[in-house]
């Protein structure tokens, strides 16, 4: 991670850390770096999408100004999901795509995330190149004039093109399925209900009334309990909860129980494997995936690989070997045959197709994967790097691992986007999880916690 770019683009409190001035400079630097390979005289084409945050308009305007000042043609997509921007960037042969969103973070935050012409997130080297320009003492980038300046146009029909692609990834409609949706008052608000209705599902929706301030507020994939209640109330066959920018999915079964990313990966992986469509019978997951996921995958004759936390690392591993399925427990799921990044709506239609074509309830499909009790605690710290390397912290982790003797695991890591240290434990019982997590968390709090 660099000075500006975290694990998922540039993020911060809008108009305080992520200012209009920084967005303008990112437009210039990003536009230049991503278009310098173009033949001389060819104008770069950049797509811009955003979620429903009130600060999106301000940052979009500033970002566009920066791109225009470098001579780029800008196509505004309006409110659309992150994977929608990634797909359209590739399918429209654009030079780059940019999404303005802070995903599942609170409304005060926002972020700017770039995609290359192939629809994939930028690699570390490209991000570093952009950072070097931002840090330069002087802006020496080209400043075209007259006819060489950039221009902007609206391409709101891009969303329809994206939905069309999603519909073509399934072979049958969802007639007879009652699907409840939670759009987190975010980027999928104008899209998800239309997608599932077009596929003949009976659709009920919550979290579908964005007002610029309510994104992720008590709704969406980070608050699935709201949708769980709604599924029970409506008697739906399943529920699908997206996050603010639509790149995650957490599902709810017909009983109102949560089906997380691990279970969705297992269900989809097993189905694809049986159909002969899972490359090397392999699923790419992260170190956060539950031990139960690994046991179920193995039992079904598949292999699970592990990467660092972050969908970008999952995608890197998938690209290297052309694996078809990967994801995270948090609900980022990547179907590389159809998409270049995590896609909540794509994951939703794949899961609904499995429920429809197998004729089995989602609860039955999910029950095949056992879940080891897991506890995760986030601790706000003064310096996450110091906390991760603290002598007492490391000693306490070693102590806990020795106690476990292989029957469970501990994972302590720094958040890629916030000043947090995450302490996670899995063990045979919930009581043991609590004990291990609290033991480590207490030391982190005492030595590095914001509140001491």
From Swiss-Prot:
> What Gene Ontology cellular component terms go with this record?
cytosol
Identify which residues the record assigns to the active site: 103 (phosphoserine intermediate)
Catalysed reaction per UniProt?
A: alpha-D-glucosamine 1-phosphate = D-glucosamine 6-phosphate
Sorted alphabetically, which keywords does the UniProt record give? Isomerase, Magnesium, Metal-binding, Phosphoprotein
InterPro entries, A to Z: A-D-PHexomutase_a/b/a-I, A-D-PHexomutase_a/b/a-I/II/III, A-D-PHexomutase_a/b/a-II, A-D-PHexomutase_a/b/a-III, A-D-PHexomutase_C, A-D-PHexomutase_C_sf, A-D-PHexomutase_CS, Alpha-D-phosphohexomutase_SF
Cofactor: how bound:
Binds 1 Mg(2+) ion per subunit.
HAMAP family for this protein: GlmM_B (MF_01554_B)
UniProt-recorded name of the protein:
Phosphoglucosamine mutase
Organism lineage string: Bacteria, Bacillati, Bacillota, Bacilli, Bacillales
> Gene for this protein?
glmM
């Amino acid at each position: 991670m660099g000075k500006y770019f975290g694990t998922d683009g540039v993020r911060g409190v809008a108009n305080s850390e992520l200012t209009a001035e920084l967005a303008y400079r990112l437009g210039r630097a990003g536009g230049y770096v991503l278009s310098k390979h173009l033949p001389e005289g060819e104008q770069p084409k950049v797509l811009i999408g955003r979620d429903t945050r009130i600060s999106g308009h301000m940052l979009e305007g500033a970002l566009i100004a920066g791109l225009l000042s470098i001579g780029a043609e800008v196509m505004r997509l309006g409110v659309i999901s992150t994977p929608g921007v990634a797909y359209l960037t590739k399918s429209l042969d654009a030079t780059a795509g940019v999404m303005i969103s802070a995903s599942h973070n609170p409304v005060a935050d926002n972020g700017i995330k770039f995609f290359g012409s192939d629809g994939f997130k930028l690699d570390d080297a490209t991000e570093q190149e952009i950072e070097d320009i931002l840090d330069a003492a002087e802006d020496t980038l080209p400043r075209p004039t007259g006819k060489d300046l950039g221009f902007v146009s609206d391409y709101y029909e891009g969303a329809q093109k994206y939905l069309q692609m999603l519909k073509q990834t399934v072979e049958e409609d969802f007639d007879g399925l009652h699907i409840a949706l939670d759009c987190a008052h975010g980027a999928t608000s104008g899209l998800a209900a239309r997608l599932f209705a077009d596929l003949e599902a009976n659709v009920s929706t919550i979290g579908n009334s964005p007002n610029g301030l309510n994104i992720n507020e008590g709704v969406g994939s980070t608050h699935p309990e709201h949708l769980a209640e709604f599924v029970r109330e409506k008697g739906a066959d399943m529920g699908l909860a997206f996050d603010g920018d639509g790149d995650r999915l957490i599902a709810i079964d017909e009983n109102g129980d949560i089906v997380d990313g691990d279970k969705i990966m297992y269900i989809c992986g097993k189905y694809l494997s049986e159909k002969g469509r899972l490359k090397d019978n392999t699923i790419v997951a992260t170190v956060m995936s539950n031990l139960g996921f690994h046991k179920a995958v193995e039992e079904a004759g598949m292999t699970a690989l592990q990467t660092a936390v972050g969908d970008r690392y999952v995608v890197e591993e998938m690209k290297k070997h052309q694996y078809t399925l990967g994801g995270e427990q948090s609900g980022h799921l990547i179907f590389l045959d159809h998409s270049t990044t995590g896609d909540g709506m794509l994951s939703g239609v794949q899961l609904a197709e499995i429920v429809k074509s197998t004729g089995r309830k989602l609860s039955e499909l999910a029950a095949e994967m056992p879940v080891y009790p897991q506890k995760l605690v986030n601790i706000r710290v003064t310096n996450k790097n110091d906390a991760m390397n603290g002598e007492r912290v490391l000693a306490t982790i070693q102590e806990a691992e020795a106690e476990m003797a292989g029957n469970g695991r501990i994972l302590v890591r720094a958040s890629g986007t916030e000043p947090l240290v995450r302490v996670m434990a899995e063990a045979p019982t919930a009581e043991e999880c609590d004990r291990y997590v609290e033991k480590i968390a207490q030391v982190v709090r005492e030595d590095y916690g914001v509140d001491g």
